[in-house]
From Swiss-Prot:
Belongs to the transaldolase family. It comes from Priestia megaterium (strain ATCC 12872 / QMB1551) (Bacillus megaterium). CDD domains: Transaldolase_FSA (cd00956). The active site is at K89 (schiff-base intermediate with substrate). This is 6-deoxy-6-sulfo-D-fructose transaldolase.
Length: 226
């Protein structure tokens, strides 16, 4: 399974790339806002930081106010020219899907986002989108069981040998990462703190303290590993 970082903060991305071996980045307008920097400044930073780095997709979302395919294609084409790493992120609406089809014709990779059902996930795969992003956290917050919905998308894609990669998005904790892995999703994208939490466990800390105490009480005749 691939790990993408859901962030627009360069310091977080750099740390995760260097230390966690993340495979890509996803952004959205909210993450851009939280970075405290203008949209184009963030894109310029990304393009510079990862220039020459291959197979490291960075999903950049177009202006969410655009509501027709022509305008989406026009803006997305300009964004794609800024970096070979950029993937154009577009909403799963009818105009968005029409735009995605045109992008793929032009050889521009797309990430169809804001997907909340298997039926929505079908058309992105049919038109050859590079990625599709079904959301988990928002649905679970409303009381929905998301495990089966992700499994259904995975199974449908297998039935028809679709090449679109599934990015399970809006994850809130380590359990949701595991659920996505068990369902067979290709990728998860999480915030910095969610990954940090997923690397930890209370019993790991408990066991480490016990081993430290044992180490400190071990009598040795000579210093070890000086």
């Amino acid at each position: 399974m691939k790990y993408f970082l859901d962030s627009a903060i360069l310091e977080e991305i750099r740390y995760a790339y260097e230390n966690w071996a993340i495979d890509g980045v996803t952004t959205n307008p909210r993450h851009i806002m939280n970075s405290g920097k203008p949209f184009l400044t963030v894109l310029d930073e990304f393009a510079s930081e990862f220039k020459g780095v291959e197979n490291f997709p960075i999903s950049v979302e177009i202006n969410p106010h655009l509501d027709n395919a022509k305008d989406m294609v026009e803006e997305g084409t300009k964004i794609a020219k800024l970096s070979s790493n950029f993937v154009i992120k577009i909403p799963c609406t009818e105009p968005g899907l029409i735009a995605a089809k045109e992008f793929e014709k032009q050889g521009i990779s797309t990430n169809v986002t804001l997907v909340f059902s298997p039926s929505q996930a079908l058309q992105p795969a049919r038109i050859g989108a590079k990625f599709v992003s079904p959301f988990v956290g928002w649905k679970e917050n409303s009381g929905d069981d998301t495990t089966q919905y992700i499994q259904d998308i995975v199974n449908i894609y297998k039935n028809y040998n679709y090449n679109t990669e599934i990015i399970v998005a809006a994850l809130r904790n380590g359990k949701q990462i595991v659920d996505a892995a068990k369902a067979g999703a290709h990728i998860v994208t999480c915030g910095f703190d969610v990954y940090k939490e997923s690397f930890q466990h209370a019993f790991t800390d408990y066991g480490l303290n016990k081993f430290r105490n044992a180490w400190d009480n071990t009598v040795t005749e000579a210093p070890v590993l000086k």
